[in-house]
């Protein structure tokens, strides 16, 4: 999956409602004020919130999101972006959730089991789950039928437009055939219902109102991780009929139905979202929730710091300049409160656009020729020193952010306990290299010297009419000075690593939507974007870049290599050969279903081929420093799925947590994982 005051009698909620964030910061600097009483011994309802320090927990909490990560779809069955899931995970539950250690735990399913060869999985459902509307009024009872309706919606090309079909079509008997059937039927498929799906032989049945049985194509011992994804979430046929297909597909917080821990109290686009407890939440007695959770959209980290200082945010991530301001003054009150967060479960990469357009819609032939050249791409992976850029995200330990792989660390382990990316490292030849805080691992073999590659690329490209320097167009949101600062450092990294005679970064801006203003018209040379796993297997990462697959997200929506494949130019022959070879390697690995170790070894070879040919160039892991009133280690920490922003069972404190406390949290977490 593919990021976002108070004075006198003005409450935090009413202030944020009445003013934009930028205006709010100005008002705060003029009048200040103290935070309203927001603490208490318990959260909104149900269980006590975790409390390992004896602190006074918060009843209300104000978090933040980057302004460029505003929600675009409220429909979890339709959306494929993490920025959407981060919101809707609080509103819409599926079969399972996760705990703070990343372990699968019951949600609507109370238990599940597989047969001996893991081809048949049975899920047992709760009998006390209801759909409610935006006012918290009960609309319908949830049964196994709602999960049948949900899967039919996902697999129906006319309804869900091919979104989120990869998991069910890869794993469920008959799912791919049913999807193709609906695709061939065109608009007529809109009339199909879940019974039509069952009659077509799709491997899902509901023997009673509270039992679901999935039949997999092949043995799949990790299918429970697959079933945790949003492709398998419930939907109400009553609501679909009431709204109609197009309106349900584009539903929003006012007309959707809820079954998660919260409902939306208020949504101001580009400003705030506030959630209050779902009064009919099935698990209310067993989880702690906030009386109000507010998410404020932040366009600038400097503003975020000011809001935090005024207690109009309860947590912020710190950029390089703010950390420098704090650490350069030994008397700064925040020195003892700097908290290094654990890595977010995602991996960021530079996704090249192989079919770039100019602003007037004509092809950018110079870039398209350059990026099709293998030596040109290899300069990015083997020569681009990003240490200074990493400092923008982690000033104190920048190289902790280095990402050398396409698949994120921690996704899965083989039967010998080897973490998957260590297998990729072995294929790449740097498995013996360790973090040293000084040099990027992938630059150590040649010291970052790409002079021979650069010479080769320039000679080969000059011969086909490419002019230098090649302009690499990179877009940032216009309203963010932090994004501009980050891009300025990245531009200097390009200059220092490539030389201004070879590749120059051209920083451009968009107003509000990267998708609508940049990706859809194909204006970018590359986008740096993160992927969080949907389930616990490498195919979920590597399958997003393959050819000949409608579900390969990046191939269709970022690199546009799927479009190139329709009519490649002569200069793109080698590029297409590389993608075909990569696709064959991925498909061969995915065909290994009875030997986990052999499967992962084969995927590692495919990933190494991708990296050697730099079809994508990995960039960083998100390991930030923060100031916070929440214990990060109490939050959901799933390696896959979209549940990590679900605000249940958070440990919070009226007083900010300290560096020492966070170090203790980290040690306790590591001990629990290892024990």
Briefly describe each language-model feature range:
Residues 110-175, 213, 304-307, 366-372, ...:
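Aromatic- and charge-enriched surface segment that lines or borders ligand/interaction sites
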Residues 67, 265-279, 294-361, 387, ...:
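Extracellular/periplasmic solute-recognition and catalytic clefts
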Residues 139, 143-149, 209-215, 261, ...:
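Alpha-helical secondary-structure segments
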Residues 63-117, 257:
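N-terminal lobe/hinge region of extracytoplasmic solute-binding protein
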Residues 379-426, 478, 482-492, 518-675:
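Detector for C-terminal structural segments
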Residues 269, 307, 397-398, 434-533, ...:
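Ligand/substrate-recognition segments at binding pockets and active sites
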Residues 187-201, 205-210, 215-294, 655-675:
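Gly/Pro-rich hinge or "lid" segments in bacterial periplasmic/extracellular proteins
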Residues 1-10, 14, 18-28:
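N-terminal secretory signal peptides
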């Amino acid at each position: 999956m593919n990021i976002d005051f108070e004075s006198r009698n003005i409450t935090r909620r009413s202030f944020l409602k009445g003013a934009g964030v930028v205006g709010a910061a100005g008002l705060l600097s003029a009048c200040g004020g103290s935070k309203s009483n927001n603490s208490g011994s318990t959260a909104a309802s149900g269980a006590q919130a975790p409390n390992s320090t004896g602190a006074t927990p918060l009843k209300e909490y104000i978090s933040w999101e980057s302004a460029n990560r505003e929600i675009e779809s409220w429909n979890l069955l339709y959306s494929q972006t993490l920025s959407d899931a981060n919101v809707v995970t609080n509103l819409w539950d599926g079969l399972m959730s996760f705990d703070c250690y990343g372990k699968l735990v019951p949600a609507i399913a109370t238990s599940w089991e597989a047969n001996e060869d893991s081809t048949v999985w049975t899920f047992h459902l709760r009998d006390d789950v209801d759909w409610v509307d935006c006012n918290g009024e009960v609309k319908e009872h949830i049964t196994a039928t709602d999960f049948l309706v949900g899967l039919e919606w996902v697999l129906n090309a006319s309804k869900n437009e091919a979104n989120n079909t990869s998991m069910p079509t890869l794993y469920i008997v008959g799912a791919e055939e049913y999807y193709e059937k609906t695709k061939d039927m065109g608009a007529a498929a809109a009339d199909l219902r879940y019974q039509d799906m069952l009659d077509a032989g799709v491997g899902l049945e509901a023997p009673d109102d509270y039992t679901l049985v999935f039949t997999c194509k092949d043995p799949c011992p990790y299918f429970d991780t697959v079933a945790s994804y949003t492709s398998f979430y419930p939907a109400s046929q009553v609501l679909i009929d009431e709204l109609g297909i197009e309106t349900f597909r584009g539903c929003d917080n006012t007309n959707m139905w809820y079954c998660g821990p919260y409902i939306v109290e208020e949504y101001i686009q580009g400003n705030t979202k506030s959630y209050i407890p779902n009064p009919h939440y099935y698990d209310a007695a067993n989880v702690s929730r906030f009386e109000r959770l507010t998410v404020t959209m932040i366009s600038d980290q400097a503003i975020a710091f000011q809001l935090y200082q005024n207690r109009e945010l309860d947590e912020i991530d710190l950029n390089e300049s703010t950390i420098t301001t704090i650490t350069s003054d030994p008397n700064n009150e925040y020195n003892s409160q700097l908290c290094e967060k654990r890595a977010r479960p995602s991996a960021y990469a530079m996704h090249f656009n192989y079919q770039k357009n100019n602003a007037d819609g004509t092809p950018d032939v110079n870039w398209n020729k350059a990026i099709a050249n293998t030596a040109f791409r290899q300069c990015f992976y083997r020569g681009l020193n990003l240490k200074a850029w990493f400092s923008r995200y982690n000033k104190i330990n920048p190289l902790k952010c280095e990402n050398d792989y396409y698949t994120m660390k921690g996704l899965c382990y083989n039967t010998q306990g080897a973490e998957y990316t260590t297998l990729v490292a072995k294929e790449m030849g740097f498995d013996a290299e360790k973090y040293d805080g000084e040099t990027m691992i992938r630059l150590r073999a040649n010291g970052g010297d790409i002079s021979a590659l650069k010479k080769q690329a320039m000679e080969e490209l000059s011969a086909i009419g490419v002019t230098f320097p090649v302009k690499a167009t990179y877009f940032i949101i216009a309203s963010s000075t932090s994004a501009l600062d980050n891009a300025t450092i990245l531009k200097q990294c390009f200059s220092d690593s490539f030389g201004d005679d070879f590749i120059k970064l051209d920083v451009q801006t968009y107003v509000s939507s990267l998708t609508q203003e940049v990706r859809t018209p194909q204006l970018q040379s590359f986008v740096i974007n993160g992927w969080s796993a949907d389930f616990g297997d490498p195919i979920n990462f590597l399958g997003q870049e393959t050819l000949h697959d409608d579900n390969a997200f990046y191939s269709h929506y970022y690199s546009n290599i799927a479009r190139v494949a329709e009519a490649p130019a002569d200069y793109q022959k080698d590029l297409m050969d590389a993608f075909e070879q990569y696709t064959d390697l991925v498909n061969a690995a995915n065909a290994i279903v009875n030997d986990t170790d052999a499967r992962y070894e084969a995927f590692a070879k495919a990933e190494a081929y991708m990296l050697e040919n730099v079809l994508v160039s990995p960039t960083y892991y998100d390991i930030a420093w923060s100031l916070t009133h929440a214990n990060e280690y109490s939050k959901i920490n799933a390696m896959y799925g979209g549940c990590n922003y679900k605000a249940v069972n958070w440990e919070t404190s009226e007083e900010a947590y300290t560096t020492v406390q966070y170090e203790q949290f980290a040690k306790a977490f590591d001990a629990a994982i290892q024990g």
